[in-house]
Amino acid sequence: MNHEDSRPWFQKPTRVLQFNIEDRYGSSIEGLTGAELARLAHDLGANVLVIFARDGWGRIFYRGGEVGPEHGKMVGDIVRDAVREGRKLGVRVVAMVAHTANRWLYKKHANWAQVNARGETILLEHVPYHEEGYEPEWPQMCLNSPFKDFIKEEVREALELGVDGIFLDSFRYQPDYERSCYCEWCRRRFKEEYGYDMPEKPDWRDSRWRELWDWRYRVVIERLRELYSLVKTRKPDALFMYNSHPGGWAGRTNRVVEEGREYLDAVFAECSEADHQPPGFITEMVKLTKAMLGEGKTVWASRNYFHLYRTVVPSTPLNIRQGLRETIIAGGSPWALIFSNSYAQDRTALNAIKEVFEEHKQIEEYLDGAVPLHYAAVVVSNVTRDHYGRDKPEHYVDEVRGFYHALKHEHVPVDFIAGRDLVADVLRKYSVVILPNTVCLPNHALNSIREYVRGGGGLIATYLTSTCGEGCIEKYEFGLAETLKARFRGVLKLPWTYVTQARHDHPLLEGIPQTPILVGDMSYDFTRERVAPHMAWHTIIKSDADVVAQVALPASEWGFEYTLGRSPPALAGATGLPAITASTYGDGKTAYYTWQLGRHYWRVGLPTYRRLILNAVKYVARVDAPVKVQAPETVSTEYFTQGDRLIIHLLNHTYNQRIQAIGIGKTKQPIPGYSTSAAVHPPREVIPIKDITIKVRVGDPSKFTALAPLKNGSTLQTRGNGEWLVISVDTLKEYEVVVIEPKG
């Protein structure tokens, strides 16, 4: 597509190289020039270079600035030289500024730093828990202190260098108690605004603590708004971007993006956790970030050059290639991150970046302007994560991820929806909307959901969904009681439970063996609790819906087999309490689960839980998904439309097992393990997949064709089957794109 004349450069297909110089002594940059960095980006196929204007020690990488000392080992004028060379090569340069870590400034103004309630300086770096007497290397400066004016000057200086964009990297101000700021500036401002002191201890029962928690987000968004305005006033066509790091920092920054999206041109989804997360993590984070940022904005996501945190040596070329492709298939722009030490010591895997960037350029036509195929959507509520999950966000997030991954494994088109987008115009795009323990739902969202289902939409809800309203305050009733045909009577709190079938012929139980379904999981910590908190709990409901399955009780608190005290107990008998219900509301259908179905699939991964999720989607959906892929679950599929085209990405994750070992926690009288419980490997080899079949509902198959752009646009074998076009992919090695379009 050609929107060259109207769109900002950052809304067009981009390939990004981030080159980080994070070295106390700077030995890795001796002799390194800005022009060399621009040429490196160009040679690898990138059209954007991201570099520091100022590092975490406070040193600047350009000459003549006033916001910090020049880096002592800088050759030439790195940022300006990169900009000049980039102009010649067609490489845009984005400057990283306003890093909240600044050691030089801290040494001059220690009282500008963030400090926690104990008076400890809040750190960006990782320090062993019991290390004493540590001097901060990357102290975090406070966004309420005079640092807020200092970073504005940083932005002004960077723009004067001629850069094409401003990137706020590691712009951190957390609400979490250990990392939340209690400096004099924060205390003073908060008291002026609210009339009382900051609560010193976390107490979610206290409205003052909840207000303080939410206030910290407003501080960050206020700074984003000020800096965005500054950038757009001085250089309207410059990019303004924020690093959200969506799977890190307890996921809190997703709320910053959701609530501050009006002040962001783009978001960088840093994915440094990718090597100890499942294959597909980067794809998941891109889709999550796109939901938070809103339609039509740009998400760039990173694949590190290195494995885990071993920054001085590269990962496997396969791992680098597949990680970059994970971004592409999710509709993001690929971003490769390399550190100066690994560039100095080992460049052997750089060609992996070049290969994927060349692929990306080859398929630009099919990426530009493509939009996701809307079918199923999983709602992500940042307010629920914060106010329900609190200091255990995984108790909510695992439920979300379980539904998402189950549908990904079944090749069902699935997106995320941000809480603020629970409005009619967004909901009606989808055949199915999933509320995975979405506890906190304000009235306007409830009204939109009711309207959506009444109009024929399909709704899946679990556990405590809609039991809290405005401000996430308990209502002791479902806000969606009428829609779900369920009344909330309480919570059954047991360490283990079961679900048994009441109507085995119901579509929600299709393909499910008529055996008890275990609810609950053991604790992998096992220091204070035997089981994962709340996992076996059920809402107690009075239901006018069809009761498809019921809650059953265990015979004891824990099991006596194998590992006595850790194993689950045997089944005792059914209670008659509903566990799964099905109903209609207006023209739509609903399925409700009194327990946390998604959390079970995320933690345990048994096929019964996945089949229950798939059945629910098929049951409540208005229509079948318009595309079906027959391939192993290790093949990641993503679907986009582009005018009359349907574009399908196939990414093969059929690797060696990445996570080799995991601990199961300690017990009384512990003994050493047999080997380390923390072994994480990169993918080394991909197993090709044969005979993948794709079915697309097109109406008249004779009018459509399928081609493979990465195979020189070769035509794929197709046949008609009623209204379905059936496409055969003989062999999937690492990555393929399939384009279905009208003939002629």
Located regions from the model:
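Carbohydrate-binding surfaces of carbohydrate-active enzymes
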Residues: 2-5, 11-13, 209-210, 214-254, ...
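Boundary/entry segment of secreted carbohydrate-active catalytic domains
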Residues: 2-30
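A cross-domain feature marking catalytic cores of carbohydrate-active enzymes
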Residues: 19-21, 53-55, 93-99, 170, ...
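Short, acidic/polar
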Residues: 25-43, 145-157, 250-259, 316-324, ...
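Aromatic- and glycine-enriched glycan-recognition loops and surfaces
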Residues: 25-44, 65-90, 148-150, 219-223, ...
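Active-site-adjacent "subsite" loops/lids of carbohydrate-active enzymes
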Residues: 27, 95, 99-161, 186-217, ...
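Catalytic domains of carbohydrate-active enzymes, especially glycoside hydrolases
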Residues: 32-58, 161-163, 324-326, 406-412
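Aromatic-lined carbohydrate-binding/catalytic grooves of carbohydrate-active enzymes
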Residues: 37, 42-78, 101-123, 128, ...
